[in-house]
Design a protein with these regions (language model features):
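Short, surface-exposed loop or secondary-structure junction motifs
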Residues: 1-158
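Short, surface-exposed beta-strand/loop micro-motifs that present aromatic residues
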Residues: 159, 166-179
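Glycine-centered small-residue hotspots that permit tight backbone geometry or close packing
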Residues: 71, 164-167
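A short acidic/small-residue loop/turn micro-motif
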Residues: 186-189
Length: 191
């Protein structure tokens, strides 16, 4: 069959986590991960926590919100869900993103504390079928056609990461313990 990218599973994952934990998704993420690893600039709805002057605009939305999106999620599904979703809406800086990638690269451990089982990280960072290079949660390098790969030519098969529509990219190379984070606002002012 034909491969088509979809992030709807992560939209539903938010609801599943909320139902199982009886906690809002943003509180769950903050209390389970971000606060515990010192990712103090990572949050949903950043205008409630971070000064607008420290947030880059992501786009001008001429259709739906008719405003410059600064501190507001770009993704329309996440926006309709109030800005907190499993597929989009998380704001951060490079240092905090690197902390999360370090946690993934180190089998779910950060600063001597265990957060995620290695088997879960392996499941989300492995290719899930032969027709595309994506895993359940992360992208993989395209080793057959490096011109189409989201990673550099020297990326190993073990590397994984994800790029965002608005211009963010985080990549992890477990083979040589390297993390790459690039944050931009490529969709501003026009997509």
């Amino acid at each position: 069959g034909k491969y088509m990218y979809s992030d709807l599973g992560f939209v539903f994952l938010k609801n599943i986590i909320e139902r199982i934990t009886n906690t809002s998704f943003d509180d769950y993420c903050n209390n389970t991960f971000y606060n515990r690893i010192g990712a103090n600039n990572t949050c949903f709805l950043p205008l409630n926590k971070i000064s607008a002057k420290n947030i880059a605009p992501s786009a001008y939305d001429a259709i739906f919100r008719k405003d410059t999106l600064k501190g507001m999620v770009h993704d329309p599904i996440a926006s309709l869900l109030g800005g907190v979703s499993g597929n989009a809406g998380l704001f951060s800086n490079a240092n905090d993103v690197a902390k999360m990638m370090y946690l993934y690269m180190n089998n779910g451990n950060y600063a001597g504390e265990h957060f995620i089982n290695k088997e879960t990280i392996d499941l989300f960072s492995a290719k899930n079928n032969k027709t595309n290079r994506r895993g359940l949660g992360f992208d993989k390098p395209d080793l057959k056609n490096k011109n189409l790969s989201p990673a550099c030519y020297s990326a190993s098969a073990e590397s994984f990461g994800h790029s965002g529509f608005t211009g963010g990219l985080a990549w992890c190379e477990p083979t040589n313990k390297t993390i790459f984070v690039f944050l931009s606002n490529r969709t501003f002012p026009d997509e």
